Amino acid sequence: MNITHRQYRILSDHIAVYQFMLEIYECDWRNGVPAPFLEYALSSDWMDKSLVHRNRIWFDDDKIVALVFYENPVTDVYFSLRPGYECLAEEMIAYAETCMPKKEGKQRLVIFGAQKALTAAAQKAGWHKEFGYWEKVRDFAVPLERKLPKGYRFASAPLDVAKCCECCWKGFGHEAEEGPWDGDTEYTGGLATAPHSTAHLDVAIENEDGEYVCYAGMWWTPENKLAYMEPLCTVPEHRRKGLAAAAMAELYRRTKPLGATHMTGGGDPFYDKVGFKPEIEWAFWVK
């Protein structure tokens, strides 16, 4: 091995890091997050990108073998590690503690349950698990079928950007906390121009008045046969009607013929009702 490291350069490293994540992907995230996880964040306005120079890449000659990075918040640190390079785990944990962002001295390490070498390194360095949860994944070997309730329909392509924005504003609780949506759609430009965007697969459900009331984004990742769903939301007054389940069934219908074998979900018990199974153990470590 000829191991070297340097800091992440956002303007030139993204595609190589994306390819690295494609190469090491496993369904239980034993080697780290899937590639669209980071691209979605970097393309979104909610991620603070002012500290990405703190992220670090390790190489074996010219091959990327490890990455330490943050997403949101900046104090949550993630680890991607190529199989065969577990010897770097302790160095990665030490770097995270020493150099990755902290606020008021606080920081968390996000280590997935299947990341055994990193878990052992964190324990050895005095970190302890604060809490965790299981993210659910839908196996496409089992058909996913849900019908839209009466009074709703799938929006025609291309989707209306403004309607998507307003749906997400309401669906993620911003209207209740900050007031009505202000009409700004500019922030969507980063997502629309992301290098691996597959927004043409996104699903929106509208009511009889033509308002979007449920939205499901799709980052189709053919190299991993992964249907990476992000985001998913329903406007509060239209919840508990089966809209999100119908949106996911439509994503299944659109991506399975492309070769998708599974779709990511989340930790909410709602996913259990649509046939998702716990697959990815999230664990948050503190000192």
Feature map (PLM): residue ranges:
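Conserved active-site tyrosine of GNAT-family acetyltransferases
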Residues: 120-122, 271-272, 276
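Conserved hydrophobic beta-strand within the GNAT/NAT acetyltransferase core sheet
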Residues: 107-111, 229, 262-267
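Short amphipathic alpha-helix that is part of the acyltransferase structural core
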Residues: 1-40, 133, 147-182
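A structural microfeature
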Residues: 66, 131-132, 214, 244, ...
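Acyl-donor-binding surface of acyltransferase catalytic domains
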Residues: 71-151, 282-287
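Conserved donor-binding loop and adjoining core beta-sheet/short helix segment
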Residues: 6, 11, 24-100, 208, ...
